Design a protein with these regions (language model features):
Chain B
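Structural transition elements
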Residues: 8, 304-341, 359-360
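Periplasmic binding protein-like
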Residues: 31, 372-424, 455-456
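N-terminal lobe/hinge region of extracytoplasmic solute-binding protein
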Residues: 32-80, 88, 111, 175
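A structural "hinge/loop" feature
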Residues: 34-52, 73, 99, 147-156, ...
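Surface-exposed binding/hinge segments that line
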Residues: 78, 82, 120-163, 168-169, ...
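Aromatic-rich, solvent-exposed beta-strand/loop patch
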Residues: 96, 139-156, 175-224, 248-266
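Periplasmic-binding protein-like
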Residues: 277-316, 362-363, 461-474
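Extracytoplasmic/peripheral linker and loop segments enriched in polar/acidic and small residues
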Residues: 379-388, 417-484
């Protein structure tokens, strides 16, 4: 197992290099001009051209790529944001604190609300609980997040005045509406996946075996069915966590939260190259680590997968 | 679970109580800002979000106060010769850290800003010479009409000592001469300013942009337009210039709220691509075919002004008589006749390129519908800001559009609006943005830029109108909605809120 | 001493005659909920195809008098900010939205399932390399990928579908890989291999039916997002250009009016919800029909 | 049929499945009795309803779609269909346990095999964890698996070993009744014999009664005392092993023997039963077997036929016994 993890960590080096080269090349072929967003709309074409030259944007691809890779991987410097004038790493970490709060809260909601809902639906297959749960789930995945967010604001912030409409200056209260709005789809999808997976597992022979042993419904459900049912859900949760750490642009925009998503989207829109490239690299690293974690959790939950990681000596 | 919930609720309540409590002390105002200023350092460019906080954060040598130019840090301006001016500062300026501002700081600021290259106008400043503690001599390489003022207004001034003391070139914690000091900057969220009790200028000499009628100013960045409305309704913000036109009725004449309407200094106009529409009659026909009233109704909820030239009529060099001239008002007969003359028949297709934004999409759609009445198709090509900015000036892209919906404005002169797209010297390929290489047009605009006398202005305007290389459409109106905490809203000449100058 | 094949149960016999596909279809046809979903989808598709002839108004016809008109008998769903009939725009918009939504979902699923099966089946090096490439692709923000596709390959419907589907592939692969890993080592797979089943057959008839369920769930839920995403592509040279209606764009146009004129958002939102709902009903039915554990 | 030594008495048991709106009659009015220490064999084709009978006894039918609309299952004086679920849980695994058909899927793939045995021990014998582990290891050794393999997972076991684990699990609490659902089908012949020997052995040691579900007449001959031939959810013929083996009367039973390779005769080909089992959702009127029965006559198609005692407790559900006897005679 440790060998496997070590191998995966080593693999991260080419992955990071791959991400760096790919993002650099994409930014290179993407039209759009960082100079124009820096100088504002009243700059003329000649002034823009001068600024581009000064920023070194007119150098050939290879020169710029080399400079970028040298700076990133040899000097470990992600550069300074064109727009904010601050270090990309510091900027990203500052934004990450908000994103992390939202991601963790949302994941918690998703797991601790979605999973029980899915279990309830599966154990009452085709019953009322199932129908209600699945209806909510469908609502969850088909209601656009911004719509839900704005409705929540209208009710709880504008009409009732319980919570702030937007911003991050009210402590935890600032995060309640964003998290509810953001996790609704996650809860829904978690519930559906749990249900689907539970249904598969509940029909398995080993569940009948467990029942035939005289175990109580609860024990059968939680000791035998759930752990098996959760295996595919690990991917969902891992992927969801990875995505959420990349920021949730819609929610961050609506609630005026200066999270990673807005930082990155703004950077993409204004072609703030250092932020885009540095951000993608760091987020890619985080994502890869989470995916590695997912694979490790897999191995812990499912001995069959662990056996596959450890080589093919498996069966005796 | 219940326990946890009640705990959370209690926490929430405690937190919200705390925030209300702190808001009670002193007079404070919260301004809703749609754009993120990002770097608030002095020598950054003029990205859209920055303009909103510029005058609260910094002072310049000169500002435009109402319709007149006034010295802010500058006490006297003396002309030495055509390209040389002496600037005399007040001799009692101190910044928020107590540093004295002297002529050497002026030299430092202009040189640093020019070297940073984010304020491209400064390229016409050749050098700044320190004559004495409070007198700096500016040497310019060239000065067109209005350039002197815009140059002196362009560069925010800070002391060299404070700038060098900052770790990040004042990107987050500028120390300036302004009456308000940044005390907290949560990047992307809020910027809070406290009034500087030791502001240097005497009240009777304070320019509008430096007034300080309130103790604390918070700019809150709210990118979503609906949330801006919600925040104002919930009175989390006191004033915003970014309330969508269709929501104005929620605040106008409503108890506790008020709305001030201020014409925007930008104008929407059409640029015709000379490569694909070389015939003046065809361009004129399109201009006649478009009904600006429709555009105002569809894109601006009925509130907007017809443009009378390429640019609006708020500039000092705008010639009054143009207001009464005919300027391609919607005329079906003329449009048909001109289309016939140009040989344009039904089935013709134009490609209209524009910068995507709600109002632009609607203007473009209105134009599309208007030309549709003549059997002419219009293909809309929307681009996001970055792509539009690139394609607009890209010679290679000129084969991909026929009409461009663009907008432009300037902080001082109409000629500066014209310069943006009509001066071929400012393009990298020696033609206007519309690919016109017309020597007469060029000589007329150069004349107007060098000397914006009504004659020169009119000559250029009339020629442009006759050729219809570009066609001014409409200027919008900004809605300043505010709670009655603000009794009179004040804006700078760029249409941005000046929270310190508002009355409470 | 054992009894030779005494007889086959009827399902098994049918499978011989109809093949696996026919068998799945047969079970699907018997599932009422799935059939309702399918019927509504077909109705929507028919509306989309016939929309140029059956919309009550021209979708692009603007009218100053009808700006933001509320739903009424003249305009069942009301009118938008340009005075255009929302019902007509939704009907016509079904063309772009359904086409883009369905096509890109199908492309993403097919590619994802192919890759996922390969990765899950072969494991080892193949797994490592493909998954790491996916790590790299997934690190790039979708918007940037789309802009790059638009810039490098130009506009056009194919590239739009590519841009929309590329984001969905990694998730599908990961899901499938995850669930194949759990069935990969089961005896029936080994048995199938030992009797010299072709790899293709092992994958399609033994591995996939046992591991596809999470993919179906995730794909059918994702289509709503895909339709919404299509709206943002029109600003970067892909997607559908105005005034041709498209549900995602209608929704984002109406977004800023949501508290003032909610009908601008509600109806396109409902249209998207309907599609998501139907596909989910169909997807659930399909999953049940494909589930080998339900055969007997 | 009253006997004081009866451990289990099933009366009129009926099981239905509802599938896509159709009602499938899996088990129809099945009655039989089992004495202490004895073994009954339920014989029939796949899908005949044998497994459903066993699962109905343990009440582990998947409900829905399955349903038990009628009947009685009397076990040690209690009607299992009426006891509470909590009481049932105390019976399952302890008094009655089951060996499942498919060892490949009967074990929880992500739980250590020993743990799965220890679980049932701990549950019913209320012992400490340590004791339950010891017992589980002992059980593993009893079925011929080294105790140290307690900590391994099912995927590390071969099919035969998994089946032994399943058996160990079923026998862990010394049940009074063992339901063995085709315990050897998934195994190869040598292991089959070992497993059967083992079951027989354990049965003798623990004086356990057993219901042996199989389609393999060889196994029946080896372990069963009585035999019930099940066809389309009904008992068609019932009798002692000797009665069934030496004097099969029902045409289906005869057919079963006909499809056995008889090493003593030099018949070149087996004679399998023609046709297919009936669709349980749409059973034929009259005798369920008549479409395939070479002796079927008019009356077989008309009405349902009752189970009749044809002597010595040998029951048969046929109205043409005489014709069959004649036909048999002719053949010989």
């Amino acid at each position: 197992m440790i060998r496997y993890i070590g191998k995966r960590l080593l693999w991260m080096i080419p992955v990071m290099l791959g991400i760096a080269i790919l993002i650099f090349s994409i930014m290179y072929i993407c039209p759009g001009d960082p100079a124009s967003s820096l100088l504002g709309p009243s700059a003329s074409a000649v002034e823009l051209a001068a600024k581009r030259e000064e920023m070194g944007l007119n150098d050939p691809y290879i020169v710029r790529l080399g400079r970028y890779l040298y700076q990133t991987f040899i000097k470990f410097d992600l550069g300074t944001s064109y727009k904010f004038g601050t270090s990309v790493f510091a900027g990203l970490m500052e934004r990450m604190q908000y994103t992390l709060v939202i991601a963790l809260l949302c994941m918690a909601l998703q797991v601790f609300v979605g999973t029980p809902l899915g279990i309830a639906a599966a154990t009452h297959h085709n019953g009322i609980a199932d129908r209600i749960c699945m209806f909510l789930a469908l609502l969850g995945v088909s209601i656009p997040a911004f719509w839900l967010a704005l409705m929540l604001v209208l009710i709880f912030a504008v009409n009732l005045g319980w919570l702030p409409t937007s911003g991050v200056s009210n402590g935890l209260a600032s995060f309640i509406l964003p998290c509810i709005a953001n996790s609704f789809a996650g809860i829904a999808s978690q519930a559906r996946h749990t249900r689907s997976s539970m249904l598969e597992v509940i029909r398995s022979d080993y569940i009948v075996t467990a029942k035939a042993k005289g175990l109580s419904e609860k024990t059968v459900l939680f000791r035998h069915a759930l752990p098996n049912a959760l295996i595919p859900i690990i991917t969902i949760v891992g992927n969801g966590m990875g995505m959420m750490l990349g920021g949730t642009v819609i929610i961050e925009n609506v609630f005026a939260i200066p999270g990673v998503g807005r930082y990155m989207t703004d950077a993409i829109n204004s072609r703030d190259y250092p932020v885009v490239m540095g951000g993608v690299l760091i987020l890619g690293l985080i994502f890869s680590l989470i995916m590695l974690l997912v694979d490790i959790v897999y191995a812990f939950v499912d001995p069959r997968i662990k056996a596959q990681y450890e080589g093919r000596k498996g069966k005796k | 679970m219940k326990k946890f919930l009640s705990l959370v609720l209690a926490l929430v309540m405690a937190l919200s109580m705390a925030s209300f409590a702190s808001a009670e002390q002193g007079k404070s105002v919260v301004v809703g800002l749609a754009g993120d200023p990002g770097n608030i350092g002095p020598f950054q460019g003029m990205g859209l979000g920055r303009i909103g906080i510029l005058f609260t954060t910094y002072e310049m040598l000169m500002v435009k106060d109402g319709d007149t130019f006034r010295g802010c840090l500058m006490k006297e301006l003396t002309k030495v010769d055509d390209l040389t001016y002496d600037v005399e500062l007040y001799d009692y300026i101190v910044d928020q850290a107590g540093n004295k501002l002297t002529a050497s700081d002026i030299k430092f600021c202009f040189e640093t800003a020019k070297a940073d290259g984010n304020l491209p106008k400064l390229s016409s400043v050749d050098s700044v010479e320190v004559l004495s503690d409070y007198v700096a001599r500016f040497h310019f390489t060239a000065l067109a009409a209005g350039d002197l003022e815009s140059l002196l207004m362009e560069c925010p001034i800070v002391t060299q000592a404070a700038y060098e003391a900052s770790a990040d070139k004042m990107a987050t914690d500028p120390i300036t001469t302004s009456p308000y000091q940044v005390v907290d900057y949560k990047t992307g969220s809020t910027i809070t300013y406290k009034r500087n009790e030791n502001y240097w200028q005497k009240d009777e000499l304070t320019v509008t942009t430096s007034r300080h009628n309130v103790d604390e100013i918070t700019f809150k960045i709210i990118p979503d337009p609906v949330q801006m409305v919600n925040a104002l309704k919930a009175k989390e913000i006191d004033i915003s210039a970014a309330i969508d036109g269709s929501y104005i009725s929620d605040f106008m004449g409503v108890e506790g709220f008020d709305v001030t309407q201020i014409p925007d200094n930008t104008t929407k106009y059409l640029i015709f691509n000379f490569d694909s529409i070389p015939n003046a009659a065809e361009r004129q026909a399109i201009a006649y075919a478009v009904d600006v009233d429709d555009i105002i109704a569809f894109a601006f909820d009925g509130i907007g002004y017809h443009a009378k030239t390429v640019g609006n009529n708020k500039y000092p060099d705008f010639v009054e008589s143009w207001n009464d001239e005919e300027y391609y008002e919607y005329d079906d007969d003329k449009a048909q006749a001109l289309f016939a003359e140009a040989g344009v028949t039904a089935g013709k297709t134009y490609r209209l390129i524009y910068n995507v934004a709600d109002d632009n999409t609607r203007i473009a759609t209105t134009i599309q519908a208007a030309l549709g009445d003549y059997g002419i198709n219009v293909t809309l090509i929307p681009y996001d800001n970055a792509l539009f900015g690139t394609y607009k000036y890209d010679d290679k892209k000129s084969g991909e559009w026929d009409i461009m919906l663009d907008e432009g404005g300037s902080s001082n002169l109409l000629t500066n609006v014209w310069k943006l797209t009509l001066d071929s010297r400012d393009q990298t390929y020696g033609k206007t943005v519309g690919h016109v290489a017309d020597e007469k047009l060029q000589s007329l605009i150069e004349a107007a830029i060098n000397d914006n006398s009504p004659e020169n202005m009119d000559a250029f305007h009339q020629y442009l109108k006759e050729q219809c290389y570009e066609y001014g459409l409409v200027s919008k109106v900004n809605n300043l909605a505010h709670t009655t905490v603000v009794t009179r809203a004040a804006t700078c000449f760029r249409g941005q809120i000046l929270p310190g100058a508002c009355e409470y | 001493m054992s009894v030779t094949a005494v007889g086959k149960d009827h399902v098994g016999v049918r499978s011989k005659r109809q093949g696996q596909f026919g068998q799945v279809m047969h079970r699907l046809r018997k599932n009422k909920v799935a059939m309702i979903g399918l019927s509504i989808m077909i109705v929507l598709i028919v509306i989309a195809i016939l929309s140029p002839w059956i919309t009550p108004y021209n979708y692009a016809k603007t009218s100053k008098a009808d700006r933001y008109a509320l739903p009424s008998w003249q305009h069942l769903f009301g009118c938008d900010g340009m005075g255009r009939d929302i019902l007509s725009r939704i009907m016509y918009g079904a063309r772009a939205s359904l086409f883009l939504g369905l096509m890109s979902t199908i492309v993403a699923t097919v590619v994802g399932v192919l890759l996922g099966s390969l990765v899950g089946y072969y494991g080892g090096k193949v797994d490592n390399i493909v998954m790491r490439i996916l790590d790299i692709i997934q690190a790039i923000p979708g918007m940037l990928l789309s802009i790059a596709i638009s810039a490098a390959l130009g506009s056009g419907i194919g590239n739009t579908i590519l841009a929309l589907s590329i984001g969905g592939i990694p998730m599908t692969v990961r899901l499938l890989r995850g669930s194949i890993l759990t069935v990969r080592k089961q005896e029936y797979i080994e048995a199938a291999e030992k009797i010299n089943c072709s790899k293709w057959r092992v994958i399609t008839s033994h591995i996939l039916p046992n591991s596809i369920a999470p993919v179906i769930v995730s794909v059918t839920m994702g289509i709503g997002n895909t339709i919404l995403q299509a709206a943002s592509l029109s600003y970067i040279g892909l997607g559908v250009q105005p005034p041709t209606p498209e549900w995602g764009a209608m929704l984002s146009e109406g977004k800023s009016m949501i508290t003032k004129y909610p009908h601008l958002c509600i109806f396109p939102g409902l249209a998207i919800m309907l599609v998501v709902l139907c596909l989910n009903m169909l997807g659930d039915g399909l999953r049940d029909a494909m589930d080998p554990k339900l055969k007997n | 049929m009253a006997n004081k030594d009866v451990l289990l008495s099933v009366k009129d048991l009926t099981v239905e499945y509802t599938s896509e709106g159709e009602v499938i009659h899996a088990v129809n009015h099945v009655s039989f009795e089992l004495e202490k220490g004895k073994t009954i064999g339920l014989v029939g084709e796949t899908g005949a309803g044998k497994t459903s009978i066993a699962r109905a006894i343990l009440r582990i039918l998947p409900e829905p779609p399955a349903r038990v609309p009628g009947g009685e299952i009397e076990f040690e004086g209690k009607d299992l269909l009426k006891v509470s679920e909590a009481d049932m849980q105390k019976i399952r695994g302890k008094e009655i346990s089951m060996i499942f058909q498919d060892p490949m899927t009967a074990l929880n793939p992500i739980m250590r095999v020993g743990e799965q045995i220890a679980e049932v021990v701990k549950l019913h014998e209320h012992c400490s964890r340590q004791e339950s582990i010891e017992k589980a290891k002992k059980m593993l050794e009893m079925v011929g698996i080294p105790g140290e393999r307690f900590y391994e997972y099912p995927h590390q076991f071969s099919g035969g070993m998994k089946q032994r684990v399943v058996i160990a699990m079923a026998l862990a609490c010394s049940p009074t009744l063992l339901l063995a659902d085709e315990p050897t089908t998934a195994l190869d012949v040598t292991i089959q014999a070992q497993v059967l020997d083992m079951i027989n052995d354990l049965k003798r040691k623990l004086n356990t009664s057993m219901i042996m579900i199989t389609h393999d007449l060889g196994i029946v001959a080896e372990v069963c005392d009585t035999v019930a031939v099940i066809y389309a959810g009904e008992i068609m013929e019932y009798g002692t092993r000797e009665q069934i083996f030496h004097d099969p009367r029902y045409p289906y039973t005869i057919g079963l023997f006909g499809s056995l390779p008889d090493l003593n005769s030099d018949v070149e080909r087996l004679s399998p039963i023609e046709g297919l089992p009936p669709n349980p959702a749409d059973l034929p009127r009259g005798c369920a077997f008549h479409p395939r029965c070479p002796y079927a006559g008019e009356e077989c198609r008309k009405e349902h036929i009752e189970l009749k005692d044809i002597g010595g407790g040998h029951l048969c559900r046929c109205c043409r016994l005489n014709e069959i006897a004649a036909g048999k005679a002719k053949e010989v």
